[in-house]
Regions:
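A conserved regulatory-domain signal marking ACT and ACT-like small-molecule sensing domains
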Residues: 1-167
């Protein structure tokens, strides 16, 4: 089962290492990790995607609460249940002729992707969506054009509505 855990922690050396170390000590794999400072420069927001049983996710959440460097921990729900998640995808495509370029432009419009760089044979597209939407976008592109390179930012998430994550 897929679990997205959002953590508010100190923005200082070693804090992220302690969080990651906890996962490692318990034998939990991190599928995706995204960290950045918040509007408060003393805090960072860390989003971790992991897979495992529900009780394992609850256990790791309880252990994270015990770390001194951690202020808040929240398990983000699926979008239908009250969570929002997004990731940025950059895809470099080989587009050797006009027919393929036109097809890529049409697909970019359908997926609300943007062409951010192009030359005679290469298009670079930018796409923002959920992990599932990103997977679908990449898979669909791969069926019509040769993908040269894919870069994914990693997952970020936030609760819907009036739920806030503050220390």
């Amino acid at each position: 089962m897929r679990h997205v855990i959002s953590i508010l922690l100190e923005n200082e050396a070693g804090a992220l290492s302690r969080v990651v170390g906890l996962f490692s000590q318990r034998g939990y794999n991190i599928d995706c990790l995204t960290v950045a400072p918040t509007d408060d420069p003393t805090l960072s927001r860390c989003t971790i995607l992991t897979t495992g049983e529900k009780d394992e996710a609850e256990q790791i959440t309880k252990q994270l609460h015990k770390l001194v460097c951690v202020f808040r921990v929240s398990a983000l729900l699926e979008e239908a249940e009250g969570g929002l998640e997004r990731e940025l995808v950059l895809v470099k495509l080989y587009t050797p002729n006009r027919s393929i370029r036109d097809e890529v432009k049409s697909l970019a419009d359908i997926f609300h992707a943007r062409i951010i760089d192009l030359n005679a044979e290469i298009f670079t597209l930018e796409f923002v969506g959920s992990s599932a939407e990103s997977d679908n976008f990449i898979e669909t592109l791969g069926k019509i054009v040769e993908i040269q390179e894919v870069v994914r930012s990693g997952l970020v998430g936030i609760a819907k509505g009036s739920h806030f994550m503050k220390p």
